[in-house]
Each structure stands twice: as C-alpha cells, then as structure tokens.
Amino acid sequence: MLLWLAQYFQDELGPLRVFNFITFRAVFATLTALVIGLVTGPAVIRMLTRLKVGQAVRTDGPQTHLIKSGTPTMGGVLILVSIGISTLLWTDLSNRFIWVVLIVTLGFGAVGWVDDYRKVVYKDPKGMASREKYMWQSIIGLFAAIYLAFSVSAPSNSQFLDLFIAWVQSGFSMDLPPKADLIVPFFKTISYPLGVWGFIALTYFVIVGTSNAVNLTDGLDGLAIMPTVMVGTALGLFAYLTGSANYSKYLFIPHIPGAGELIIFCGAMAGAGLAFLWFNAHPAQVFMGDVGALALGGALGTIAVIVRQEVVLFIMGGIFVVETLSVMLQVAYFKYTKMRTGIGKRILLMAPLHHHFEQKGWKETQVVVRFWIITMMLVLFGLSTLKLR
C-alpha cells in the first residue's frame, strides 16, 4: 500500500523513489512486524489469559511440562496479525505470489484456530479430528498447487489463464516450461520435468507436509519459531535472487518474475517470529498453538515451491523433517510390533524427537538451543547450493 502512495507522489517528492527498492521495503517490513508484535504482545497475552484459553498439557509427557498447564495458547494470532499488517503495508499489492502466500497462510491459520479452539473449550489435547484437519488442509493445499502449477510458469495473470486453458484443451496432458522443473541442488544442468500432475502432487505434499512438520516441532518453548525465522529468512534471499533476471542467470536458478516481492513477506515473517520469541522464550508466557504453527509451515512450503527450492527446503528444514519422521516411525513400529507380538514397542522413549531427548535427561533449553544450532548449520548448507554447482 505504501508503495502505491510513494509512486503516486514520487514526482513531487523525489526521495519517495526509495520505496521502489525491494530491499528497502523488506527491511522495514521486518521492523514493522517486529514492532507490532512487541507492542501488542502484552495486550494479546492479557486478553488470552482473560479468555482462559490455556494450553491443556499431555499427562503422559515429561513431568516438567505439567507446570505449563494453563499457559495461554493461540499466540499465533499475534504472529499472523503482525505478518498481515506489515506485508500489506510494504508489499506491491498487485503481486500475485504475495496473495497466494497470504491466502495459504491465513487458510491454514484458520484451520489451526479451530483446532486450538476445540482444545481450549473441550480441554482435549487432541483438538480437531485428524481426518477433518487433513481434509481442510488438503483443500487449501490443492488450491495453491493448481494455481502455482501455471502461475510459476507464466509471467502474468493473463498468461496464467492462457496456460491453464491450453492444458485443458490438450486433454490435461500438456507439459510445463523448464522453469517448473524440480531442481537438483549442486547440479546446475540437472532438473526433472514434473508435468502438471507431478507439479500439483509435489506442491501439495510440500505445503501440507511442511505445515504439519512445523506443528509437530512446536512442542517446547521457542523450538519451532526460531528455525522458522531462519528458514524463512533464507527463503527470502532465494526469492530475491529468483525474481532478478541477472542474479538468476548468474546462479543458474530459474527466473520467476515477481517472486522477488516475497522477500517482503519473509521479512515480515522473520520480524513477527522474533517478536513472538520475546514472549515464547523459556519460560513461555504464551504458546503459538496450531493457529501459528500450521500457518507458518504452510507459508514456508508455498514460498519454497514458488522459488523452485523444494529440495533445499527439505535440507534447511531438516529439524522439521526429522521431527516428523520420528513420529511416523514411532507409530509405525508400535503398530507393527503390536500386530506381530501383541505388545506394542517403541523406537524412541517418546515422540516427537525433542521429547525423547528430554526423557534422556536433557533440559528443555538444551534441546531447544541445540536444535537451533543444527538448523543454522542446515540453513547455511542450503544457502551454499546457490554457488556450489
């Protein structure tokens, strides 16, 4: 919105031309979201406390967590409000990628809000039924996947529609341009054509999978939010480079016109995340809840698809991946052993993985900081794929 105003008055006020620089707006989007979060955070926490939206803690979990019972949850609302206001203020509102990321973020946030509401009202840690949750996530994820399959390949909305019509007229068998291929990191000439159906399937699993992975990771004070900030910031850099014709050509990455504007959203997400961490650091004054975790994960997945860095997201978000795999393996092994022997056995002391380390004697803060360090290393490794080709 501010960009439009600046462009309208820039002939009379020359210094307003600085708003045309994406990097300038990204910095101030970060600061704006940070300030909004820090200023409104105490009021939001007081409101959540007054509404008695306290977190119901698992009784079969680490005993040290029982003291957290009653801590306000649904703090992800603070993150989403900060991101939304900052993004709308500083971004180019005509950019189609900004809107699809916002819609996915708010859509997954709405699913998480309903889940949190049921947990709070019914005092049930399980919240929304898994089948119902996945249904709504799938609807949003498929919407984004179908749109991005053609939007990533088209420089404008009008060409997006032409591409979609051509696909329908081809009997749903048309291939997509090379820029929609799956990129293999470290190899500048190797990529895999996905086709429309392959692109839709991959995008769906990346968005929905990342959303749930971040949600599973959000089990300790500050554990999920800092890796989200680090991965989101790195994706912002990828977005900036992908949106630049010169940088993308030099680095042998696809040039996606308009993708650079996503650095504004990533900056806002980083600022909002740091503001939330101020209140979520141990001992947490507020929890993110599903409303925040599902939304942030969905945003990360969507941005990674747009900038064609799905594999790099898998690398940088390694903590999210391992946490998810720990749950899947734990459940699968328990069911398998129960079917074979009648007694279910576990691979880990407790899943997700962060609880396993707690049960082994690690303090909560040790688990959190060590996972942060691992994420920082993985993010740097992911960024190295830009040049090591």
Swiss-Prot record:
Describe the reaction catalysed, as an equation: UDP-N-acetyl-alpha-D-muramoyl-L-alanyl-gamma-D-glutamyl-meso-2,6-diaminopimeloyl-D-alanyl-D-alanine + di-trans,octa-cis-undecaprenyl phosphate = di-trans,octa-cis-undecaprenyl diphospho-N-acetyl-alpha-D-muramoyl-L-alanyl-D-glutamyl-meso-2,6-diaminopimeloyl-D-alanyl-D-alanine + UMP
Instruction: Identify one Gene Ontology CC term for this UniProt entry.
Output: plasma membrane
Main localization category: membrane
Q: Where in the cell is it found?
A: Cell inner membrane
Per UniProt, the keywords (alphabetical) are:
Cell cycle, Cell division, Cell inner membrane, Cell membrane, Cell shape, Cell wall biogenesis/degradation, Magnesium, Membrane, Metal-binding, Peptidoglycan synthesis, Transferase, Transmembrane, Transmembrane helix
Q: Which sequence ranges are marked TM in the entry?
A: 21-41, 70-90, 97-117, 134-154, 189-209, 222-242, 259-279, 286-306, 311-331, 366-386
EC? Answer: 2.7.8.13
Q: Which residues form the signal peptide?
A: none
Q: In which pathway does it act?
A: Cell wall biogenesis; peptidoglycan biosynthesis
Query: What CDD domains is this protein classified in?
Result: GT_MraY
Alphabetically, the GO molecular function entries are: metal ion binding; phospho-N-acetylmuramoyl-pentapeptide-transferase activity; UDP-N-acetylmuramoyl-L-alanyl-D-glutamyl-meso-2,6-diaminopimelyl-D-alanyl-D-alanine:undecaprenyl-phosphate transferase activity
Membrane topology, as annotated: Multi-pass membrane protein
One GO biological process from the UniProt record?
A: peptidoglycan biosynthetic process
Q: What class of enzyme is it?
A: transferase
Q: Which cofactor does it need?
A: Mg(2+)
Q: Which HAMAP family does the record associate with it?
A: MraY
Which PANTHER family does the entry mention? PHOSPHO-N-ACETYLMURAMOYL-PENTAPEPTIDE-TRANSFERASE (PTHR22926), PHOSPHO-N-ACETYLMURAMOYL-PENTAPEPTIDE-TRANSFERASE HOMOLOG (PTHR22926:SF5)
What function does the entry list?
Catalyzes the initial step of the lipid cycle reactions in the biosynthesis of the cell wall peptidoglycan: transfers peptidoglycan precursor phospho-MurNAc-pentapeptide from UDP-MurNAc-pentapeptide onto the lipid carrier undecaprenyl phosphate, yielding undecaprenyl-pyrophosphoryl-MurNAc-pentapeptide, known as lipid I.
Q: Which family does it belong to?
A: Belongs to the glycosyltransferase 4 family. MraY subfamily.
Protein name per Swiss-Prot or TrEMBL: Phospho-N-acetylmuramoyl-pentapeptide-transferase
- UniProt lists the gene as mraY
